Swiss-Prot record:
It is found in: Secreted. GO terms for cellular component: extracellular space. Pfam families: Defensin_1, Defensin_propep. It comes from Mus musculus (Mouse). InterPro entries: Alpha-defensin, Alpha-defensin_C, Alpha-defensin_N, Beta/alpha-defensin_C. Residues 20-58 form a propeptide. Paneth cells of the small bowel. This is Alpha-defensin 2. Residues 1-19 form the signal peptide. Disulfide bonds join C64-C92, C66-C81, C71-C91.
Amino acid sequence: MKPLVLLSALVLLSFQVQADPIQNTDEETKTEEQSGEEDQAVSVSFGDREGASLQEESLRDLVCYCRTRGCKRRERMNGTCRKGHLMYTLCCR
């Protein structure tokens, strides 16, 4: 049952990341122009108070990053994420 819940949460997360447009502010535009930044942290939350049963320990420990290159060791590719017009690989561990 846990793998099914985890898989469902990851699918919903990837849909949410692709569906939510990110508005560019001046600060975000400056960040995009800096080519030195490779990795960006992503905040992941599953459900709300009604869906609190989904927040099992395995889901709360999930950490995801948007990476310009491939995933690092012990990370799995879980889709893509977008910031403005740039596409990144969504890597979770």
